[in-house]
Amino acid sequence: SVTEHFNVYKATRPYXXXCADCGDGYFCYSPVAIEKIRDEASDGMLKIQVSAQIGLDKAGTHAHTKLRYMAGHDVQESKRDSLRVYTSAACSIHGTMGHFIVAHCPPGDYLKVSFEDADSHVKACKVQYKHNPLPVGREKFVVRPHFGVELPCTSYQLTTAPTDEEIDMHTPPDIPDRTLLSQTAGNVKITAGGRTIRYNCTWGRDNVGTTSTDKTINACKIDQCHAAVTSHDKWQFTSPFVPRADQTARKGKVHVPFPLTNVTCRVPLARAPDVTYGKKEVTLRLHPDHPTLFSYRSLGAEPHPYEEWVDKFSERIIPVTEEGXEYQWGNNPPVRLWAXLTTEGKPHGWPHEIIQYYYGLYPAATIAAVSGXSLMALLTLAATCCMLATARRKCLTPYALTPGAVVPLTLGLXXCAPRANA
């Protein structure tokens, strides 16, 4: 049961640890110090480890509505409902157990955890943390849709059952407390108040030791004494933000709840684009409801991939070759296209129809062939004209040199001979 899962905390206690910003921009020893923030989940969920213990009352008994924290040298409890997690805005807390919180948070540049103590004072810790989760899939949506498509993703499983991952617990350090010392007529009085006090004075007699009752160090001053509360009946997390105890060996362990697991996430499906097919190209009209990824690539030896985030109505023209092209719009499945060898004209029709047919299939070769044939025709025409002029001249020259000669009618017609003048 869940209560049994919390039994591992019976031998532990919360603690106060160093926090650089306790919510007001100043350093303090916070009862809700942030130890670690984990963001391995692809669905954007965070797992946060803090110094307070959630789901336990002051005595260490499982109580879902409580959290316990260290106030000075004593453990106190408060309401779990006062627990808050923030980035740029409030986070949604999905689960808590002991030192751990799992929550979904909006993007932000910091993370803050706070609660109200037994006296209704806000206790907090704030750390610099860049939270900008990548979207699941290819669409940057804000609200998970009712309908869409399920994609594989990872998330923190909301279970408090034991796992293979653990955190180390060790003996708490002695906590210095100058308020335990008071000056009385040249003597230093140590007020135990029911606690075990370790003291060390550099002056006077019987000046080093431990005591659980009030004690006076004669002929001494407060500045010459050091007093600390020592309590080793419980363990606490081995934190880098807490002074280490004299006994540094691991004393116990607590399992880390909410393991990372493979799940599916529902994501939106972008509206299908309007498609217009052209000659070796396709025109897409895109209507995104939110920033949506558009990408395409060639299916040939060189894919030349291209992608962009589209956040407003856009029109894109992509080339389609015989080797094929593939485009994908948002979370829709990819679409593959190939250019078909279609053309106009007729392969066995009139010359202009033949040229039109082959131009559609092989434009460069057709232009070269037509240009070559046209050039040959022009050269042939020029040569023919030259030969005809030469033949005419040779045919008419004898008659031109003979006085009174008459050009025969047939030759005159073939050589376009001028009429004779009287």
Curated annotation (Swiss-Prot):
It comes from the Viruses. The keyword Aminoacyl-tRNA synthetase does not apply. Structural polyprotein: Specific enzymatic cleavages in vivo yield mature proteins. Capsid protein is auto-cleaved during polyprotein translation, unmasking a signal peptide at the N-terminus of the precursor of E3/E2. The remaining polyprotein is then targeted to the host endoplasmic reticulum, where host signal peptidase cleaves it into pE2, 6K and E1 proteins. pE2 is further processed to mature E3 and E2 by host furin in trans-Golgi vesicle. Spike glycoprotein E2: Palmitoylated via thioester bonds. These palmitoylations may induce disruption of the C-terminus transmembrane. This would result in the reorientation of E2 C-terminus from lumenal to cytoplasmic side. Coiled coil: none annotated. Glycans are attached at N200, N262. Residues 1-359 are extracellular. GO terms for cellular component: host cell plasma membrane; membrane; T=4 icosahedral viral capsid; virion membrane. Residues 383-422 are cytoplasmic. A lipid is attached at C385, C395, C416 (S-palmitoyl cysteine). One of its GO terms (biological process) is virion attachment to host cell. GO terms for molecular function: RNA binding; structural molecule activity. Keywords: Capsid protein, Glycoprotein, Host cell membrane, Host membrane, Host-virus interaction, Lipoprotein, Membrane, Palmitate, RNA-binding, T=4 icosahedral capsid protein, Transmembrane, Transmembrane helix, Viral attachment to host cell, Virion, Virus entry into host cell. The keyword DNA-binding does not apply. The chain crosses the membrane at residues 360-382. Residues 395-415 are annotated as: Transient transmembrane before p62-6K protein processing. Structural polyprotein: Translated from a subgenomic RNA synthesized during togavirus replication. Spike glycoprotein E2: Plays a role in viral attachment to target host cell, by binding to the cell receptor. Synthesized as a p62 precursor which is processed by furin at the cell membrane just before virion budding, giving rise to E2-E1 heterodimer. The p62-E1 heterodimer is stable, whereas E2-E1 is unstable and dissociate at low pH. p62 is processed at the last step, presumably to avoid E1 fusion activation before its final export to cell surface. Structural polyprotein: As soon as the capsid protein has been autocleaved, an internal uncleaved signal peptide directs the remaining polyprotein to the endoplasmic reticulum. Spike glycoprotein E2: Processing of the precursor of protein E3/E2 into E2 and E3 results in a heterodimer of the spike glycoproteins E2 and E1. Spike glycoprotein E2: Spike at virion surface are constituted of three E2-E1 heterodimers. Spike glycoprotein E2: Interacts with 6K protein. This is Structural polyprotein. It comes from Ross river virus (strain 213970).
